[in-house]
């Protein structure tokens, strides 16, 4: 004899955030405390590793479109380690006069670590996106983030995007950036982006990676560093960012 069937999971509402929360128990085992799908992304566990959890952020619908509000909340508990994997990039399509938002909030507890290997974020012609990343790191917490912003699909000039990044370490500002690329005429000026339509970066927060100097590396006022590259095409930049990200990840493993 069986009981009543388990209730079906409630479908995500348009404003529901995707939630990923991981922790490490007293035995050292990593646990996913919460994996909640949102309106646009569903967290899916990958094959486990002994020293971390690996979670894929899988797209569940097309987007971004006008009026969309993608929200992501990630928390890493004390001493825990999380790898976020994006199987594919994200495209903001023609908004036809509207706007959309992409917002991520990251909280990393003492001794926690997050490695986020982001895939390209494409802002198609006609899109207008507000993109916000807020990161809070406790003492001893670390984050490695790879990010690629592409202005336009092939043959397009690209839409409008404004990205704001704010990171705090031990209660103090570590990185505050406001990158306003909403006016194509201004962003294409010499000294801004010029002819480049791809902006790629690797950012380390909570630690300052050692190793050979990079001509486009900026060391932050606290424990952190960033390398940012500009290009007209993606392959060469992606190869350089991949190599740099892997080097910094390896250095982080041995820190």
Swiss-Prot record:
Q: Which domain of life is it from?
A: Bacteria
Where it sits in the cell: the answer is: Cytoplasm
Which Pfam families is this protein grouped with? UreD
The signal peptide, as residue positions, is none
The record, for InterPro entries, names: UreD (IPR002669)
So what family is this one in?
A: Belongs to the UreD family.
**What is the protein name given in its UniProt record?**
Urease accessory protein UreD 1
